[in-house]
């Protein structure tokens, strides 16, 4: 269906256009945005969910909600920190889906590329338009052909949120090798999950409603270095560190599930 969005334009979007895993993130960001004291705000996500006009509450259970809010805050803050050090960096949101990180962290000088598979970018263009410093681009995380269209830069910052957790170990290796081969130096912000989650996709409170399953899980980001020795692990933070700030359940999960929850790992090469 079509409904007006910002600027009076219309969003021509159907429920089937959106991958199930993307619905999880969209539903959570939309519902959080609608709260009076929202910790994150994503008006575009709310517009998308409102346009679809369907019940997506099953994709918004408590723990997944808190996890997505936490990772959104953690990615945003880490990106701002890196951009403050490299204000002219080229930033690439690889596997961007409907994510709108550019508006959260833009400093007025970065160049930003939202990259995803062609079918996903085609749907994204129903929602977003290219801007002077924020461009959408077809690209595969397992094939670096697209990287030749990325301009030269003194620093590259690659964001992969909710992507690598669905890859096999071989696919993770292919992706890491591709990044290091394609860009002479850079940072990678990656979402990692545990071996426990790899084995229990169908027990996940939101993913169980999709056909998706988690791929290779790790106990530490150091395991990535075995696949790509050119990379160094700069930092690794469990989402529990953010989630425990907001609720008793979050604080309890930080204790009983400290080795289960996902992490934000930062790599450099």
Regions found by a protein language model. Name each.
Residues 2-92, 96-139, 152:
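Rossmann-like AdoMet
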Residues 144-154:
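Short amphipathic alpha-helix with an adjacent loop that forms part of the alpha/beta core around
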Residues 158-159:
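A conserved beta-strand element that flanks and buttresses the S-adenosyl-L-methionine
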Residues 166-178:
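A short, conserved alpha-helix within the catalytic core of class I
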Residues 182-195:
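Conserved beta-strand signature within the Rossmann-like core of class I S-adenosyl-L-methionine
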Residues 195-212:
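Short, glycine-/aromatic-enriched active-site segment of Class I SAM-dependent methyltransferases
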Residues 212-238:
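Short alpha-helix
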């Amino acid at each position: 269906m079509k409904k007006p969005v910002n600027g009076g334009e219309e969003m021509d979007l159907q429920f089937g256009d959106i991958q199930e895993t993307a619905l999880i993130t969209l539903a959570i960001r939309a519902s959080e945005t609608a709260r009076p004291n929202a910790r994150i705000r994503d008006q575009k996500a709310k517009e998308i969910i409102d346009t679809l006009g369907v019940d997506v509450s099953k994709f918004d259970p408590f723990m997944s909600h808190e996890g997505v809010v936490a990772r959104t805050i953690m990615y945003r803050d880490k990106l701002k920190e890196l951009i403050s050090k490299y204000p002219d960096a080229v930033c690439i949101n690889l596997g961007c889906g409907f994510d709108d990180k550019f508006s959260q962290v833009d400093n007025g000088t970065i160049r930003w590329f939202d990259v995803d598979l062609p079918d996903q970018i085609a749907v994204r263009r129903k929602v977003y338009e290219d801007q002077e410093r924020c461009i959408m681009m077809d690209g595969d995380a397992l094939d670096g052909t697209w990287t030749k269209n990325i301009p030269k830069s003194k620093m590259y910052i690659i964001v992969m949120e909710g992507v690598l957790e669905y890859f096999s170990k071989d696919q993770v290796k292919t992706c890491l090798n591709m990044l290091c081969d394609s860009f002479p130096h850079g940072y990678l912000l990656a979402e990692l999950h545990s071996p426990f989650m790899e084995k229990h996709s169908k027990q996940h409170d939101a993913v169980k409603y999709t056909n998706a399953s988690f791929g290779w899980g790790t106990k530490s980001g150091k395991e990535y270095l075995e696949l790509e020795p050119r990379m160094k692990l700069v930092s690794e933070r469990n989402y529990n560190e953010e989630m425990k700030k907001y609720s008793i359940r979050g604080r309890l999960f930080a204790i009983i599930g400290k080795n289960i929850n996902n992490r934000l790992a930062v790599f450099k090469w």
